[in-house]
Amino acid sequence: MTTSYLTFLAVAVGPPLVALGVVRAARWDGDRARAAGVGILLALALSYTTPWDNYLIATGVWWYGEGTVVGRLWQMPIEEYLFVITQTLLTGLWVQALPLRPTAGFSPTRRDAVLGALAGVLVGCGGAVLLTVDATFYIGAIIAWAAPVLALQWAVGWRYLWRRRRVFAAAVLVPTLFLSAADRYAIADGIWILAGQYTTGITVLGLPIEEGAFFFVTNVFVSQGLILYAWVLARWR
């Protein structure tokens, strides 16, 4: 019997989310502005992901197993909205548990901003090319969708992110590996099914590369956002 989407979230995402919440509460330093960073990113994640997710579901890039969801809001199951929320919280709390140590004195140049934005544009161009072929449509949709956010974040502080690359790597890789493993189970169990028409068929340890790319990109969004947010706060103070 296929696991329900809600049960999957409760079992796979719930325990680490609660554990990170307990750690965050134990380390609470009263800095409301810093804590607000996760809330800001949560609102942005929902508003940016919802139309994209709905479009891909409507296109038939993936669908859900029979009886695995409790209801839908537009094309997306209610649980999908919960997944966006819980992933953002999970990664956000993880990032804030790391030693960010923002460097207030670091200042980017206009040239840095231009280079960062151009890099994001190049990513978008690559995604647009992949969108033209059915087999790479899903991976192209992920890359093209990621490009505007990456362009903005890199324009703001790609050089600062490079200086904090070790923390950034830990911030991204740990939740990406965890969520990819959980996603691998969900696909194997039939909670959601990817369309062969829109995917490459390439897998790593049974996980479609498109799904790994999605979790990598979204965790990059959250990690870069919070690292840059902490840096901007330090500069303002």
Curated annotation (Swiss-Prot):
* Main location as per UniProt: membrane
Q: What happens when the gene is disrupted?
A: Strains lacking this gene show undetectable levels of bacteriorhodopsin, retinal, and beta-carotene and accumulation of lycopene to high levels.
Name the pathway it acts in. Carotenoid biosynthesis; beta-carotene biosynthesis
Among its keywords, does the record have Transmembrane?
A: yes
Top-level class of the enzyme under EC nomenclature? isomerase
Instruction: Please write the reaction equations for the catalytic activity of this protein.
Output: a carotenoid psi-end group = a carotenoid beta-end derivative; all-trans-lycopene = gamma-carotene; gamma-carotene = all-trans-beta-carotene
Subcellular location, record wording: Cell membrane
One Gene Ontology CC term in the entry: plasma membrane
Write out the GO MF terms: intramolecular lyase activity; lycopene beta cyclase activity
Q: Which residues cross the membrane?
A: 3-23, 38-58, 80-100, 113-133, 137-157, 170-192, 213-233
What UniProt keywords apply to this chain's record, in alphabetical order?
A: Carotenoid biosynthesis, Cell membrane, Isomerase, Membrane, Transmembrane, Transmembrane helix
Pfam families linked: Lycopene_cyc
Domain of life, per the record? Answer: Archaea
Q: Per the UniProt record, which EC number(s) apply here?
A: 5.5.1.19
* Biological process terms in GO annotation: carotene biosynthetic process; carotenoid biosynthetic process; retinal metabolic process
Q: What's its membrane topology?
A: Multi-pass membrane protein
Q: What does this protein do?
A: Catalyzes the cyclization of both ends of lycopene to form beta-carotene, a retinal precursor. Is required for bacteriorhodopsin biogenesis, a light-driven proton pump with a covalently bound retinal cofactor.
Q: Which family is this sequence assigned to? A: Belongs to the lycopene beta-cyclase family.
Give the protein name, as stated in the record: Lycopene beta-cyclase
Q: What is the lineage of its organism?
A: Archaea, Methanobacteriati, Methanobacteriota, Stenosarchaea group, Halobacteria
